[in-house]
UniProtKB/Swiss-Prot annotation:
It comes from Thermostichus vulcanus (Synechococcus vulcanus). This is Photosystem II reaction center protein X. GO terms for cellular component: photosystem II; plasma membrane-derived thylakoid membrane. It is a single-pass membrane protein. The chain crosses the membrane at residues 12-28. One of its GO terms (biological process) is photosynthesis.
Amino acid sequence: TITPSLKGFFIGLLSGAVVLGLTFAVLIAISQIDKVQRSL
């Protein structure tokens, strides 16, 4: 019973990391676009 829970834990951890990465990427992209628009 240890293996399935461990697998689920890793899947949850991986999906959480992916979501965090995407969120950071979007925030960085928005800030970069904002800088470009201000410079123009």
